Regions:
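Conserved mixed alpha/beta catalytic, RNA-binding, or beta-rich assembly cores of soluble enzyme
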Residues: 1-61, 65
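Short terminal or interdomain "cap/linker" segment that borders an active site or interface and mediates
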Residues: 56-135
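Short conserved micro-motifs at the rims of enzyme active sites and ligand-binding pockets
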Residues: 16, 135-137
């Protein structure tokens, strides 16, 4: 299993906060752009891992983050501790388990010796059958 964390840093939060004070519509666009940037960064990093582990005959499983499905947000703190995130990249978690800076990601990526596709996605893989957000697949 690979644990990883990434952040755009405090500058992204500061810029969004500053813009929201005078032009909310532009702040919303900046918020979306920053979210896309951190996801693109993680995707690129995952592709690099795919190449590196592929040389060893290993295949990556999909990236999965605390807060997805039944993977509790309470896992954020152990992630950050294990990866020494505060010291290395300035990433912390609030008392309400939200990452700070806000444009940040923690996730796990599984490794397998078999190249199998995931046939289940989203709500299909989650065991929370009574979830108010559950969608039929």
């Amino acid at each position: 299993v690979i644990l990883f964390a990434a952040t755009l840093g405090t500058q992204a939060d500061q810029l969004i906060r500053r813009i929201s004070g005078w032009k909310m519509s532009q702040a919303v666009v900046m918020q979306a752009a920053a979210a896309a940037m951190i996801e693109a960064y993680c995707d690129g990093w995952q592709e690099e891992l795919k190449r590196e582990f592929g040389k060893q005959g290993l295949y990556l499983r999909p990236r999965f983050s605390p807060g997805y499905g039944d993977f509790p947000l309470s896992c954020q703190l152990p992630f950050l501790r294990a990866l020494q995130c505060q010291k290395r990249i300035g990433l912390t978690v609030t008392d309400s388990l939200i990452l700070a800076p806000s444009k940040s990601v923690t996730a796990v990526i599984g490794l397998s010796r078999r190249d199998e596709k995931c046939h289940k996605h989203g709500c299909e893989v989650c065991e929370k059958t009574e979830c108010p957000f559950r969608r039929d697949s």
